[in-house]
Amino acid sequence: MADELENLTGVVEGITYRNEANGYAVIEVKTGDEFVTVVGVLCDITVGEQIVFQGEWTMHPNFGRQFKSVRLTRSRPADASGMHRFLASGIIKGIGEATATKIVEKFGSNTFNVIENEPERLAEIKGISKSKAKRISKDFKMQFAARDVMNGLAELGFNQQEAYDIYSVLKSDSLDIVNENPYALVSLVGSIDFARADEIAMNMQQAPPFDCRCQAGVTYIVRHNLFNGHTCLPRNSIIKPAMLLLECNEDEAEIAIDNAIDAKQLVEENIDGKAFLFLPEIYEAESGIAERIKVMIEYPPAPKEISPAEIDAFEKTNNITFDEKQREAIEIAVNKGLLILTGGPGTGKTTTVKGIITLMENRGLDVALAAPTGRAAKRMTELTGKEAKTIHRLLEVEYKDGATEPSFAHNLKNPLECDAVIVDELSMVDVTVFSALLDALPLSCRLIMVGDKNQLPPVGAGNVLADLIKSELIGVVSLDKIFRQAMKSKIVSNAHRVVNGEMPVFDNSVDSDFFLLRENSKYNAAGKIVNLVTDRIPSGYGFDSVRDIQVLCPSRKGEVGTENINALLQAKLNPPSYEKNEIKYKGYTLREGDKVMQIKNNYDVPWFKDGENGTGVFNGDIGILTRIDRANDIINVRFDDKEAMYSIENVKEIELAYAMTVHKSQGSEFAAVVLPTIATPPKLSYRNLFYTALTRARNLLIIVGNEASVKAMVDNDKKSRRYSALVHFLSVDNVAFFK
């Protein structure tokens, strides 16, 4: 690619826009007699710098010709005029316009040499003390040290974004680490994968040792499989992938694994006589969960005995009647403080949780509510009447520049200030988040875990809810009685039929909430979905096409996948207009007014809400794209009641959300759901995916397909295998606390 890039050399004359979070900037550069707009990741650029940019010319729809830089080489200003502009920019602490003028007038083109090598001479200038001179010199050296590192990374072949990410994590050690072993970046810097590290290594004058490459390769295979939900992998299962990736033989692959273990890049654990490999941080999280759970069992909170009469009083006050299992759940939660509460729709989980909250608070206990996503937390708040927070917000997420995982203000050293935590939608919580939550619980804190064991496992690694239930160490109350009011809903009754492997009953009568719109053609199905969302459902039920109706697709691809359905619905609900700005990215268009979804956690995006501000948007958040500001390359998205502001470089983190995959819908509830089942890929045609989709609908569910496609999903109770070790670690013999 480097051969295709053009060079542009010039002096920075002005900075139009800068995003401190990701380094993106818009600057004005003077090259000869011409002024050029340069855009890209331009870290710590200052007025007066002379820079060689590498990139390509682009045409901005509003602002014309621009140079998009992907690499740059910086040189220090060589003349007095350039030095003055640089110092006057304010980048060096203690030097403003007036001081910069005094320094350059005295030392001329020798200014930088004096600051760097003879800082005591700065004290010859009135207003600069010896101590201030030392501070100026120190800050000056730090500024150019960063520039030297960025230049060095560019010379090795990294683009500006990669160099920024590397420097954010490794700081002044960046070049030393990369030159010694570029493969170390695969585990240290989230944006550098094995293929990219391999490319850099192959172009280095002195390639790193072969064993460094092999260790990184086998570690990468284990890390990559986190995205498939595995916390660990059988050792023998990565031999062939390693041989293909590294182009090595079996013995070399085995040696690479052993070396990675010796280097603490992997951890090996014997589980039922079979060797499994973990990333160290996942091993620590999963084994740590087990140890914390064991401690909670061994040292329970002081009992807060509850009498049947108190539960009776709650029933009378709220005009409800608990069944036997609900009463059992309340007693365990209040008295013992450790409980898993499961149940499908209509079984009274929410009512039970309300009872637990009230009876705990009646005993003076401070109760915190949490859920894995913003949508799930909002729903929990609405159902319980008590504020629920995302787990990240409850723990006060902190995210350091370039880090691949967040840290939290609340942890073992700084626990939460509460007596009980109730966490909903536990089936969505992965091992790293659950481990962080347990670490933040104070001693003797009650923990009530609520979820539906029949829903999909989390997108992240692990299977926490299923593994905790399987361990049989924690009290589990499974609510299975469908209450009379809920039984009126065909959505609820059919969801329970599906769980039991029975076909749903299709009742297409006017007063039903569960319909099958029969269709055998995937092409016709796409058109019918659009008609349902844009016309039939809004006119028949009064639901808003964007706010209330959600299309859930098993797959992203195909005629009835999210990509095609989103394009069709966008064209109908939010067509192009001269009054609406838009941006194109990888073949699709985002337009002002579009329904969009955040597809990865980003802890740096700033947001504003009724005078309050903060940072962080999360995977699965749904909002409306309210503004595309091409002048400053900024986009705004309104998520519920907060407005987030993105650099246009982060457009890759949002996508259209008129339709979403069933996996992305976890933890959400929509007034109306449209679910295509026709042409579902066999690997996605299974029962708990179908069940999860059904249980996302509150008032209306319309399936577009046929009985055969539904039956294929109901009959397939095979779950994709997830390797995890929580049950193993929870066994008595494998937890250090009990040894």
Regions from the language model: what does each represent?
Residues L339-T381, V450, F514-S521, R536-G558:
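Conserved RecA-like ASCE P-loop NTPase motor core of nucleic-acid helicases/translocases
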Residues K453-T615, T626:
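Conserved helicase motor core of P-loop NTPases
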Residues M1-I306:
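Accessory, non-ATPase domains that flank or precede helicase/AAA+ motor cores in DNA-metabolism machines
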